[in-house]
């Protein structure tokens, strides 16, 4: 792995120059989990949360988060995203909810940060909508699971099947 790219020789932070990079299809998939009490899980599963459709609102928030990543992370390039897909999986065994975001663009830099931001914002929205009944929810295991495209090529997390 190469050195840190967001610092110059003097150690000052800067936005990486991607002007000379080739435009390619870029895809990143991120995943995260929010663990909660069984009663909170039941409210989400049964659609009975007082604030409304928890996962529907969280999906829209996650998409918005991906689109606004460059406003939140100082050295991220603003990107024209071509696709943001967000899915939630209810997990009775935790109990909790998994969030998976896939973000795509055709450009000169990757979309890993956008995928991570989508997952975090989606899970934060679940927390916000359910905190009145469960302040002990825990957001955990947020990570990039896969990335495709660009000079460094494709990558999958080692524990990712397939």
UniProtKB/Swiss-Prot annotation:
| Residues the record lists as binding substrate | 75-77, 113-114
Q: Pathway, per UniProt?
A: Cofactor biosynthesis; molybdopterin biosynthesis
- E.C. designation(s): 4.6.1.17
Keyword Transmembrane helix included in the entry's annotation = no
Q: Which domain of life is it from?
A: Bacteria
Active site annotated at which positions? 128
Q: List the GO molecular function terms.
A: cyclic pyranopterin monophosphate synthase activity
The Swiss-Prot or TrEMBL record describes its family as follows: Belongs to the MoaC family.
Function recorded in the entry: Catalyzes the conversion of (8S)-3',8-cyclo-7,8-dihydroguanosine 5'-triphosphate to cyclic pyranopterin monophosphate (cPMP).
Name under which the protein is recorded: Cyclic pyranopterin monophosphate synthase
| Organism the protein comes from | Burkholderia ambifaria (strain MC40-6)
| Name of the encoding gene | moaC
